[in-house]
Design a protein with these regions (language model features):
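Short alpha-helical scaffolding segments that buttress acidic/His motifs in well-ordered protein cores
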Residues: 99, 113-117, 154-158
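Hydrophobic alpha-helical connector segments
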Residues: 61, 72-105
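Actinobacteria-biased recognition of intrinsically disordered, low-complexity terminal regions
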Residues: 1-11, 182-188
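Amphipathic alpha-helical segments used for helix-helix packing
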Residues: 103-121
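Short, basic, alpha-helical segments at the C-terminal edge of helix-turn-helix-like DNA-binding modules
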Residues: 64-70
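Hydrophobic/aromatic-rich alpha-helical bundle segments in the mid-to-C-terminal region
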Residues: 122-188
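Helix-turn-helix
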Residues: 12-15, 19, 23-57, 61
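Solvent-exposed, amphipathic alpha-helical segments
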Residues: 19, 23-26, 73-80, 112-116
Length: 188
């Protein structure tokens, strides 16, 4: 019989961040208890505070991880698109489609992003969100080779995608746009 694998502190930290991301995505910063996070992660609350000094530290770690996932998504899709085309519009489109696939595969990525934006009333959280959002902007601009206006359009469309995705099942980008143009929203 082989002995059970003991997780390192780094592995346990990663598990706690993953559990926190799920809880914070649903309940937000203020509405999520560290007890719920500890239970989901399978650790005690005192151990959670050993790993992360405060609830805010844990929230910030989850937000950073969420932005890193989004950045990796943009980097990977941008690099692949650049092998097929040097046209910035084509590269941006590929990155946008990859982002939609990321949100569809893991809706908590979007939910946590939105919770991060909502928690920006806190100066420390705002600083982390701002820095990471700027890094996303820089990554998209550099990888796509697009001019600043095109990058601005990419992020504006991304925010619209975020709104449509957060509305929930049954609403598509196309029928949402139709409703913005004067029709009634249609549920699929």
């Amino acid at each position: 019989m082989t002995p059970a694998h003991r997780l390192t502190a780094d592995e346990r930290r990663d598990d706690v961040v993953a559990a926190a991301a799920i809880e914070f995505a649903t309940g937000g910063y203020a509405g999520t208890s560290t007890d719920a996070i500890a239970r989901r992660a399978g650790v005690s609350q005192p151990y959670l505070f050993q790993l992360f000094g405060t609830k805010k530290d844990l929230f910030i770690a989850a937000i950073r991880d969420c932005f890193r996932r989004t950045q990796r998504n943009f980097e990977e899709s941008g690099k692949v698109a650049r092998t097929a085309s040097t046209d910035p519009a084509v590269i941006l489109e590929s990155m946008g489609h990859a982002y939609i696939r990321l949100l569809m595969a893991n809706p908590n990525v979007l939910r946590l992003q939105l919770q991060g934006y909502a928690a920006c009333v806190d100066d420390d959280i705002r600083s982390v969100v701002r820095t990471n959002y700027q890094l996303l902007w820089k990554t998209v601009g550099e990888l796509s080779g697009a001019d600043p206006r095109a990058v601005q359009g990419f992020f504006a469309q991304g925010m619209l995608i975020n709104v449509v995705a957060s509305i929930g099942e049954g609403v598509t980008f196309e029928n949402f746009l139709d409703s913005l143009l004067g029709g009634e929203p249609k549920v699929c």
